[in-house]
């Protein structure tokens, strides 16, 4: 302790970021695949430029010294990149179903598709019942097709991890973290944080290539509003408000 007292705060952060510290103190739980079942169709969604096809994934905030960490549920629309994040204590049905109900309602446009990896927190009868009630189709990632849920996984790193970090957060802080998400993080991501949107071009060999240009950057709100006849996609009672 005498030696530690002389170490600067910045160096303590460096030590905590080391591989040795991470291996000794922290453990991250990966999504557990379900056993082979017929729930959900294995295919990549094809929205054809229409919003309403969301990708969803779970982010674990790590275990430390035997204490379980909380989980973030991250849902992203493929076309507009509209993003909704919800934090729960655990990914059991008790917490997941109420969270998913709130998240699905939070999207301003009508939802058509719900795509997940093969995690048991999404591929189960309770989620199917919820989606059927809302007339939303469930699809799941194909075997050995790592790009099927790439959008949600990339947003895990570029938004959830970037803002909330990798450090362990105990489960009992889930309500406070979720309050931060709903009040600050979700509005920031959708109304203030620009995203790259690809433009498809044909190269000299006749192959399609995606280009990410700065002039095509938009916030999810602006991207939604820029769609042809965008009002047709909005849920009943929701309108585009003029922003100052």
Task: Kindly give the residue locations of the regions a language model identified.
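Secondary-structure boundary/capping micro-motif
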Residues: 1-113, 118-146, 150-244
């Amino acid at each position: 302790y005498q030696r530690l007292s002389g170490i600067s705060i910045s160096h303590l952060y460096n030590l905590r970021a080391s591989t040795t510290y991470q291996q000794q103190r922290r453990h991250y739980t990966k999504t557990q695949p379900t056993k082979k079942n017929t729930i959900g169709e294995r295919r990549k969604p094809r929205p054809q430029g229409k919003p309403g096809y969301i990708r969803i994934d779970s982010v674990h905030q790590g275990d430390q010294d035997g204490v379980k960490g909380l989980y973030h549920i991250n849902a992203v629309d493929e076309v507009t990149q509209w993003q909704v994040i919800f934090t729960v204590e655990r990914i059991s049905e008790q917490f997941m179903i109420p969270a998913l109900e709130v998240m699905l309602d939070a999207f301003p446009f009508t939802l058509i598709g719900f795509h997940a990896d093969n995690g048991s927190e999404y591929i189960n009868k309770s989620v199917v019942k919820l989606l059927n009630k809302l007339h939303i189709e469930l699809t799941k990632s194909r075997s050995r097709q790592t790009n099927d849920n790439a959008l949600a996984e990339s947003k895990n790193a570029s938004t959830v991890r970037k803002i909330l970090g990798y450090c362990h957060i105990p489960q009992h802080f889930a309500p406070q973290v979720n309050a931060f998400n709903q009040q600050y993080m979700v509005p920031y991501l959708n109304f203030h944080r620009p995203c790259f949107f690809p433009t498809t071009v044909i190269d000299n060999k006749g192959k399609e290539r995606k280009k990410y240009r700065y002039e095509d950057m938009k916030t999810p709100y602006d991207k939604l509003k820029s769609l042809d006849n965008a009002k047709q996609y909005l849920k009943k009672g929701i309108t585009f408000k003029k922003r100052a």
